[in-house]
Structures are given as C-alpha cells and as structure tokens.
A protein has these predicted regions:
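Active-site substrate-recognition segment that forms the wall
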Residues: 1-109
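C-terminal catalytic lobe of FAD-dependent flavoproteins
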Residues: 83-152
Length: 152
C-alpha cells in the first residue's frame, strides 16, 4: 500500500465499510455529513452511506456490526425507510493529520500529489482542485495548510 514516490508522507491504513441504500422516493441530490456521509448517485433515490473506521482488521470482509452502525447513524438524521442494496468494505490510506495535501514531488516535478481529503474534505474537493490547477497552470501558491512541500 506504500507509494514508492511519496513514502515519506505519514499515513495509516483503515478498513472502511459503506452501504448503498435505496429510499422509497427520490431525495434532494446533495451530499450530507453528520458523523457519517451520505452521497447521491445517478439515481435520485439511491445514496452511498459511509464510512466506518476499523484500525485492526485490515481486510475486505463486511461485518454485521459495521452495517448496524451505519444504519443506526443514518436513521438518526434521515427519518425515511430505506433498503440496503449493497454493503462493501475496503482498506484505505488515511493521512495521519486528516488533512488535504497537494503539490509536486520535491525531486520530480512530473509527479503530483492530491490526497488526504477524507469524507469532510471531499466536500471541499472542487476548491482544492481549483487551487491545484492554479498552482500548476499559473504558478499560484498553494494554501500553506495543504502545501505538500511546506508540511513535510
């Protein structure tokens, strides 16, 4: 799971489980983050819901415990019936400080890095992408909090 070009960036692995759920009717197509995230799909009645964090069991097996956790959290803010259509698990890298990192490799400027968004940060992905674009195309500075070269 280590990237040989960016192996100096500290991260840890976590297993996460997500659900694909179908509601009885279409919902307003927007992403929500309330302890878990809920993101729309092409079908306005179907959403992806996640994610759990398991730091010990780094496998791709789904668990009833994680499914129950996600269903309970979803029901805490969406008071509508839903059916679980799919349940998936995967191991993902988590930037240790849970922050976005952008920039070019210090020794090879042909290698770019755009990572660390996480579920909350993904809501800001368009802004981070615009910052990275301006950095690459116009030479604009990256925000200091996410500049790869200033943080490591």
């Amino acid at each position: 799971m280590r990237n040989p070009y960016f192996d100096w960036i500290p991260f840890k692995a976590a297993k996460g489980e997500i659900l694909t759920v179908r509601f009885d009717r279409p919902l307003v197509p927007r992403s929500v983050h309330r302890g878990i995230w809920m993101a729309p799909t092409e079908d306005p009645a179907v959403y992806r819901v996640g994610s759990t964090y398991d730091w010990k069991h780094l496998d791709q097996r789904t668990t009833l415990e994680a499914r129950g956790e996600l269903e309970t959290k979803l029901l805490s803010f969406i008071k509508l019936p839903f059916a679980v259509e799919n349940h998936e698990a995967a191991v993902r890298p988590i930037i240790q400080e849970s922050k976005a990192l952008l920039g070019l490799h210090p020794a090879n400027e042909r290698l770019g890095y755009f990572n660390g968004l996480g579920s909350k940060g993904s809501l800001h992905a368009p802004w981070f992408a615009a910052c990275f674009r301006d950095y690459l195309v116009h030479g604009s500075p990256l925000p200091s909090g996410c500049d790869l070269r200033k943080n490591f």
